[in-house]
């Protein structure tokens, strides 16, 4: 499958408060923005605060299109293979950028990205998530009553690389989400390019990449090192 063309993205600077980051790399600021966090494939899994995966199923691999990337392999019957990092701070605004391809061996969806909150009960659980099946990718927001709101969908297929970028302002009821897919700003099902709602809940929030939801078939999420940054340009430079 051909690699999607890379496009130069328009961006705007934004003031970003200090994030509770414990792992990964931080780079100095520049006119193009500051990278706040990104894991290193050279450093390996220790770049993340934790990895929730069966032994040997999360690793760095070489991809013909992207070079060194992360591979999260969720074997049939296993609940998840996910990374966890970094922790977030309510009220902050930041950009995220990465590329991913999936290989899902059944018809059930897997979460390939989560903005997760603790505790899981009596909260949104995962205020923002992207889930995939073989044929469809979807972005959803979950409110404080744990009710899902589909914001966007697009067709996809196993083995296709796609790029993702999010601008997130964290808030329990007044958070915002903007989204870019394969370099293009997306319009949500609401008709707007910015969604306002729940992007934070509970007492701890953090980011997860990988594959989640137990099922009868294997699933693999291969992804580039995610970048958290103060601008869209900085977050997507390596995607």
Predicted regions and their residues:
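Low-complexity, Ser/Thr/Pro/Gly-rich disordered linker/stalk regions
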Residues: 4, 18, 22-25, 31-162, ...
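N-terminal export and membrane-targeting signals
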Residues: 1-16
